[in-house]
């Protein structure tokens, strides 16, 4: 039975079959292992292929990469592990090659994390023998995650967080014995490199319904170990952080995917007014910020960290500690700052053009994400109450900001340059210094209000402003006025 499942899984993606055929033709002893065998037996399609090699794995990976005109990525030279990345439509495909972790394949399987990941199929056999020394098939059928050995977490504590992720991916449960082992070795997570923790945490955040996995991680004690700033299990801060992620996913999860089904809550609430931006937001959130981490996934991190005291997040200390990239740190900071700005605005009336301009001047494209994050945070804090005046104002402000970003950038966010700093120095005889930038900023704010539309109008406006500065009066900026165009 499993032979057919393996064959069907390989045939589902011709490129996968091509790689297996090439490896088999080289005459090396190689095995399909780990998640590959697990997913094949479950009938779960993925773009990954895991191969264990008796011999030089990195050299073989290089040959496959050359044959496929693909990227070759060395992962661990000390353990002889490399990845081949093929970027095609629907991809990318990841083909991982690793030298056996022990003297033979059975010992290699006993050195793995969970029994459902400790099965292998020999490519030389051809696909006739399923190697399952730890009882992975039994646990796969039962839907449980069981540690291969009692010292599995001592050997690599990150396997605890991986168990949280696999639980979310597969809908399995950890056995009571495995949960007890995990709790016993939580303290050892501090020994794991922060880069590895970050990568595993991002994979948890990438799950649909990540909040459920985060809540479980909190109950297990993992979240407090990784983010001690959130406090221990059941603390208000941790619960608020997880609720914010849950609210974000409930409100916008379908918008960030290809799923065309909206929840009843979305159809019934005033959030429906924002649905016209759904396709644009789907593209926006699919953008990769760094190392395969999409904007949507990093926004979930911002939702999680946004519950922390402001002093911890304004400088990105936590994201920096997790070894996030510079771009991700700036995004998290800006999205949280944007969310807090909207929440501080409260139930005020419509935003004027200058307020919108300054918002995006300060926050750039993360202002889009932060506006939507503010809705999730407010909804989480108000226990899903969408009838308040503040909620209606938040939706209205968010609609104005999305309209400005997606439909009126050249008018409200980045108006055309009418004068340069050189023009101010030469024509208006402004002295070099901070005043040049201040005047150009004032000019842009006048433009977004529709007060200035041509270079000649810009010169006249600045002349009046300079005279006003000299006399102690300034032209009215009309910051809350309506755009004239």
What annotation goes with each model-predicted range?
Residues 1-485:
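Catalytic cores of the polymerase beta-like nucleotidyltransferase superfamily
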């Amino acid at each position: 039975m499993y032979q057919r499942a393996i064959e069907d899984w390989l045939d589902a993606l011709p490129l996968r079959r091509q790689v297996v055929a090439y490896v088999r033709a080289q005459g090396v002893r190689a095995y399909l292992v780990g998640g590959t065998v697990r997913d094949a037996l479950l009938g779960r399609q993925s773009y990954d292929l895991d191969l264990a090699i008796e011999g030089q794995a990195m050299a073989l990976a290089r040959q496959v990469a050359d044959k496929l005109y693909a990227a070759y990525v060395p992962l661990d030279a000390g353990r002889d592990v490399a990845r081949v990345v093929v970027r095609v439509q629907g991809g990318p495909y990841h083909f991982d090659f690793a030298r056996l972790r022990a003297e033979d394949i059975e010992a290699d399987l006993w050195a793995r994390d969970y029994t459902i990941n400790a099965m292998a199929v020999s490519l030389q056999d051809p696909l006739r023998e399923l190697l399952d020394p730890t009882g992975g098939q039994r646990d796969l059928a039962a839907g449980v995650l069981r540690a291969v050995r009692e010292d599995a977490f001592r050997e690599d504590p990150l396997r605890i967080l991986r168990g949280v992720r696999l639980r979310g991916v597969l809908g399995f449960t950890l056995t009571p014995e495995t949960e007890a082992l995990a709790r016993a070795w939580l303290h050892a997570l501090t020994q794991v490199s922060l880069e590895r923790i970050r990568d595993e945490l991002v994979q948890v955040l990438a799950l649909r319904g990540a909040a459920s996995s985060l809540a479980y991680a909190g109950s297990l004690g993992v979240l407090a170990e990784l983010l001690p700033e959130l406090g221990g299990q059941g603390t208000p801060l941790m619960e608020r952080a997880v609720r914010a992620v849950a609210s974000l996913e409930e409100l916008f999860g379908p918008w960030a995917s290809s799923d065309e089904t909206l929840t009843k809550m979305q159809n019934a609430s005033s959030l429906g007014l924002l649905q016209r931006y759904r396709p644009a937001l789907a593209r926006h959130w699919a953008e990769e910020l760094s190392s395969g981490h999409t904007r949507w996934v990093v926004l979930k991190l911002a939702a999680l960290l946004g519950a922390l005291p402001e002093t911890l997040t304004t400088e990105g200390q936590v994201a920096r500690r997790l070894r996030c990239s510079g771009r991700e740190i700036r995004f998290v900071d800006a999205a949280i700052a944007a969310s807090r700005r909207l929440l501080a605005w409260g139930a005020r009336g419509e935003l004027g053009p200058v307020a919108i301009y300054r918002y995006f001047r300060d926050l750039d494209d993360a202002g889009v994400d932060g506006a939507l994050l503010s809705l999730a945070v407010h909804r989480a804090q108000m226990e899903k109450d969408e009838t308040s005046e503040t909620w209606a104002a938040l939706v209205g402000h968010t609609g104005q900001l999305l309209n400005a970003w997606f439909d009126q950038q050249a008018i409200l966010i980045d108006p055309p340059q009418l004068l340069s700093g050189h023009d101010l120095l030469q024509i208006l005889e402004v002295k070099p210094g901070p005043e040049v930038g201040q005047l150009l900023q004032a000019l842009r704010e006048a433009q977004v209000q529709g007060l200035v539309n041509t270079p000649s109008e810009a010169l006249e406006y600045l002349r009046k402003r300079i005279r006003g500065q000299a006399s102690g009066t300034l032209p009215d900026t009309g910051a809350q006025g309506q755009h004239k165009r």
